Amino acid sequence: MKQTPLNARHRALGARMVEFGGWDMPVQYAGIIAEHKATREGAGLFDISHMARFWVTGPDSERFIQLIDTFDISKTAIGQSDYGIMCYEDGGIVDDIFTYHLGPDEWMVVANAGNAEKDWAWLNQHTAGYDVVLTDRSQELAMIALQGPKAESLLAPLTDADVVNLAFHGITKATVEGAAGYISRTGYTGEDGFELFLPAGEIERIWDRLLEVGATPIGLGARDSLRFEPGLALYGHEIERDINPYEAKLGWVVKLDKGPFIGSEALHDIKANGPVRTLVGLEMTGRGIARQGYPVVALDGSELGVVTTGMPSPSLGKNLAYALVKAGSLKIGAEVDVLIREKPVRATVVKTPFYKARYKK
């Protein structure tokens, strides 16, 4: 298994370690609920060095990203970033990505850990005819996230960057406690916060300092519940090879009017005809937790779809789930059954997202 530069720190903190996307990662320290609440109420510190960091440089860098990304990054100014999706020709999802505009002809693409090799190959497959250089800097630069309402006040004294006035989705060159890299106002929790891209050799020291000033270490368990409540998609759950952005309620990142890109023809047809499936929120009213893969059926037993993610919500105190179901089959307030070990357990369709994100915009 691969290890991040913070592996020894996680073990010293008593983290429970698990395999995730080929990496040895902390799933929890004090406990998932405590870590979840620490992030919602204070500042959570996450090791996300397992994610991929690819540089795209050269005269055709913007044109190349326009080819592989559903979003229109021609409007992404230097010092800004945007969320987007890479699609196959049929509209299925390769991965969701963040693209950061670092400078003239210089971009960083951040992709999911479990998809890193596939994404790297995908990018390299499509460079023909484009004057670009792709560089994988995932080993060289570590990546940590500081998230929550107290993130700004903890980080500001430790950096020369003006993080107080850094825009939502903004990115800036920064020095943190003497380590030079980048800070972005991005995250995966539904809270205000930052992601730090710093030299791997310096990251243990920065991690220790952030804990010293009051951040709480957070594992992958709480990272999942924190992203789940505000409805942030996770590859392998809400998005996947056989799911398209419109089904995943991510049509807002598909900019068909920007010109051709990989998958644009198929996505144009899907939008015109309407998606076959759609993502809905469920609140369990019967006793039980809906887990990924559990069937969702109508009260007469007919198949509707499948749960993508389900868990008890630490913020709301309810058992909630997202499910991919036949489009048009369910309205808010409708009752369905989730088959938990083949036993029907009642659930109600509810509005999403479950939790309103509290970004600083």
Swiss-Prot record:
SUPFAM superfamilies per record: Aminomethyltransferase beta-barrel domain, Folate-binding domain
Reactions performed catalytically: N(6)-[(R)-S(8)-aminomethyldihydrolipoyl]-L-lysyl-[protein] + (6S)-5,6,7,8-tetrahydrofolate = N(6)-[(R)-dihydrolipoyl]-L-lysyl-[protein] + (6R)-5,10-methylene-5,6,7,8-tetrahydrofolate + NH4(+)
The keyword Transferase is annotated on this UniProt entry: yes
Transferase in keyword set: yes
Enzyme Commission number(s) of this protein: 2.1.2.10
Keywords attached to this entry: Aminotransferase, Transferase
Listed GO MF terms: aminomethyltransferase activity; transaminase activity
GO BP: any one term: glycine decarboxylation via glycine cleavage system
This protein's GO CC annotations: cytosol; glycine cleavage complex
InterPro entries assigned to the protein according to its UniProt record, in alphabetical order: GCS_T (IPR006223), GCS_T_bac (IPR022903), GCST_C (IPR013977), GCV_T_N (IPR006222), GcvT/YgfZ/DmdA (IPR028896), GcvT/YgfZ_C (IPR029043), TrmE/GcvT_dom1 (IPR027266)
Sequence similarity: Belongs to the GcvT family.
Binding partners and assembly: The glycine cleavage system is composed of four proteins: P, T, L and H.
Its job: The glycine cleavage system catalyzes the degradation of glycine.
Protein name: Aminomethyltransferase
